[in-house]
C-alpha cells in the first residue's frame, strides 16, 4: 500500500506540474511491474543468490523473459486477484505433465496451484503475486525445455544446462504461446515431431486419460510410467535427427530393424543382437556398401578367446569349419605346423578367415557402415535363432532375418534394381561381389524398452539393464 501511495502520489504531482510547463513525462511503471523488477534485481546479492532466494532454477531465462516484456506480469491480475486465465491454462498443463513422461512435482505444481487460497491469509499480496508469477514462469520455461531436449544429457546423464540459444528459444516459445489464442497447443509445439515420439506420447496420454487415477507417477501404473518416461526422454535426445526421407532404425531391445520412409515403416526385420557381455552399441552411421558371398575375417577377440582353445585341442578345427590361417604377410599357414601349446592370447600372431558359402558366419550378405566398434549388419546360417523370443546372441553385430529384401531396397533407391539377379548369382556361385551405394542409407541403432504400435504400448525386456542407470538420474529426488 505504501508503494502504491508513493507511486500514485508521484503521478499526481507530476500531472500538476505538466499543467503549467514542459513536455509530457512517461508514466511510472505499474506497481506489479516494479515489484517484478525489484525482485529480479541482482545487484545486491548477485545472480545466483538472487535466483536461489526466489526459488528459481532457470533464473537467467526468467530474467530474460521479463526484461523483454519490460517486467509486465504474464500470469497475474494487476488488482492482486490471483491467477489470470492464461495462468490457469498453464497450471492445468503442468498438472498433466505425466502424459509427457514428466512429474508435476518437478515444476512445483502443488505450490503454484495453492495461490488462490494463500491470498486470503496474506496482506502483502503484491509481493506474494510477484513470487508466484516468477515461479510459474520458471516452471514453464523448464517444462518447455524438458519437453524439447529432455531433462538429462544423453552421455553424462547429468541435468542439462541450457546454452544461450536454447534459453532464447525457450523464452521465445513461451512468449509466442502467450500471444496465441490456444496457449496449450502453442506451448506443446516445442515437442519432438518424430514418428516414434509422437506415437508413444499419444498412446501413453490415451492410457492415462482412460485411467485418471494413474496421472500421478507415484500411484497407479508407476512401473509403466517410469518405463514410458525413460523412453520419451531417449526419444527427445534424438531431436536433431530428421524423420523425413529413408533410414534404417534398429531397436536393440525389440530385436527389430525397420526401414522407414517419410515416417512410415516399409520393411520390418527380426534381428539378433549382441549378448549382454558383448552388447550392440547405439550409434548413427550410413550403410554405404554391401558385399555378397563374403569371407569372414575373424575378430582378434574371438580368435584368441574362443578359437585358440579349440586349436590347442585340435588344429583340424579350422578345416572342419571352413577357416584358414594367415600370417602377418597374408600368406597361408598350415595349422598343423604350429605349436599351439606355446601360443597365448598375448602372442597370437595370426589372422583367421572363413571361406564364403552357406557355412560362413556372415551368411550370404554383409552390410557395412562406418563405426568405431567394427560392427555391421549381416546374414547368418543360424536361421533358427529368429524363431526365438530372446535374441541377444551375437558378439555385437546385427544378424538380419531377410537380407535379400534389405539389399533389394538399397539397390532400388539407388536406381540399381537391374543388379538384383546378379546378387542371387553371386550367392549361388560363392563369387564375391561388392555393391557401392552413392547416397547410402542412414542407420540409427537405438535402445528403446517400450514403443507404441497401433496406439498400443509394447514393453520389452531391458536386456542390457540400461534403464536402471537412466532411471537413477531421471528420478533422482
What are these regions (language model features)?
Residues 21-160:
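Cationic-aromatic interfacial patches
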Residues 1-27:
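Bacterial Sec-dependent N-terminal signal peptides
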Residues 19-67, 141-142, 158-477:
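Well-ordered beta-sheet/strand-loop patches within structured domains
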Amino acid at each position: 500500500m505504501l508503494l502504491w501511495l508513493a507511486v500514485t502520489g508521484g503521478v499526481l504531482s507530476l500531472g500538476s506540474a505538466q499543467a503549467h510547463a514542459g513536455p509530457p513525462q512517461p508514466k511510472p511503471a505499474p506497481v506489479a511491474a516494479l515489484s517484478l523488477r525489484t525482485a529480479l534485481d541482482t545487484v545486491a546479492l548477485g545472480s545466483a543468490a538472487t535466483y536461489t532466494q526466489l526459488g528459481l532454477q532457470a533464473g537467467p531465462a526468467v530474467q530474460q523473459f521479463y526484461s523483454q516484456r519490460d517486467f509486465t506480469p504474464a500470469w497475474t491480475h494487476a488488482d492482486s486477484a490471483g491467477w489470470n486465465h492464461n495462468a490457469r491454462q498453464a497450471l492445468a498443463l503442468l498438472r498433466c505433465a505425466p502424459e509427457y513422461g514428466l512429474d508435476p512435482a518437478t515444476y512445483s505444481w502443488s505450490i503454484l496451484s495453492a495461490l488462490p487460497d494463500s491470498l486470503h491469509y496474506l496482506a502483502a499480496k503484491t509481493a506474494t503475486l510477484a513470487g508466484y508469477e516468477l515461479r510459474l514462469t520458471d516452471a514453464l520455461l523448464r517444462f518447455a525445455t524438458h519437453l524439447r531436449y529432455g531433462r538429462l544429457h544423453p552421455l553424462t546423464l547429468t541435468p542439462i544446462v541450457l546454452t544461450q540459444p536454447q534459453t532464447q528459444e525457450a523464452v521465445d516459445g513461451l512468449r509466442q504461446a502467450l500471444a496465441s489464442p490456444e496457449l496449450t497447443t502453442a506451448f506443446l509445439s516445442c515437442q519432438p515431431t518424430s514418428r516414434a515420439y509422437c506415437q508413444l506420447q499419444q498412446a501413453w496420454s490415451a492410457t492415462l486419460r482412460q485411467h485418471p487415477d494413474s496421472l500421478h507417477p507415484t500411484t497407479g501404473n508407476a512401473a509403466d510410467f517410469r518405463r514410458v518416461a525413460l523412453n520419451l526422454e531417449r526419444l527427445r535426445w534424438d531431436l536433431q535427427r530428421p524423420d523425413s526421407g529413408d533410414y534404417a532404425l534398429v531397436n536393440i531391445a525389440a530385436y527389430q530393424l525397420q526401414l522407414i520412409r517419410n515416417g512410415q515403416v516399409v520393411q520390418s526385420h527380426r534381428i539378433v543382437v549382441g549378448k549382454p557381455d558383448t552388447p550392440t552399441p547405439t550409434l548413427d552411421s550410413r550403410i554405404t556398401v554391401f558385399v555378397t558371398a563374403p569371407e569372414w575375417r575373424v575378430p582378434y577377440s574371438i580368435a584368441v578367446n574362443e578359437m585358440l582353445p579349440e586349436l590347442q585341442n585340435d588344429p583340424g578345427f579350422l578345416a572342419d569349419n571352413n577357416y584358414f590361417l594367415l600370417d602377418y604377410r597374408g600368406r597361408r599357414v598350415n595349422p598343423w605346423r604350429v605349436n599351439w601349446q606355446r601360443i597365448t592370447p598375448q602372442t597370437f600372431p595370426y589372422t583367421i578367415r572363413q571361406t564364403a558359402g552357406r557355412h560362413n558366419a556372415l551368411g550370404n550378405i554383409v552390410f557395412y557402415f562406418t563405426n568405431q566398434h567394427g560392427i555391421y549388419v549381416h546374414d547368418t546360417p543360424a536361421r533358427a535363432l529368429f524363431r526365438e523370443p530372446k535374441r541377444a546372441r551375437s558378439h555385437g553385430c546385427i544378424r538380419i532375418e531377410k537380407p535379400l529384401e534389405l539389399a533389394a531396397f538399397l539397390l532400388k533407391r539407388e536406381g540399381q534394381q537391374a543388379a538384383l539377379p546378379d546378387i542371387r548369382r553371386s550367392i549361388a556361385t560363392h563369387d564375391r561381389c561388392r555393391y557401392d551405394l552413392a547416397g547410402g542409407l542412414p542407420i540409427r541403432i537405438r535402445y528403446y524398452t517400450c514403443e507404441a504400435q497401433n496406439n498400443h504400448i509394447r514393453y520389452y525386456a531391458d536386456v542390457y539393464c540400461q534403464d536402471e542407470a537412466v532411471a537413477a538420474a531421471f528420478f533422482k529426488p
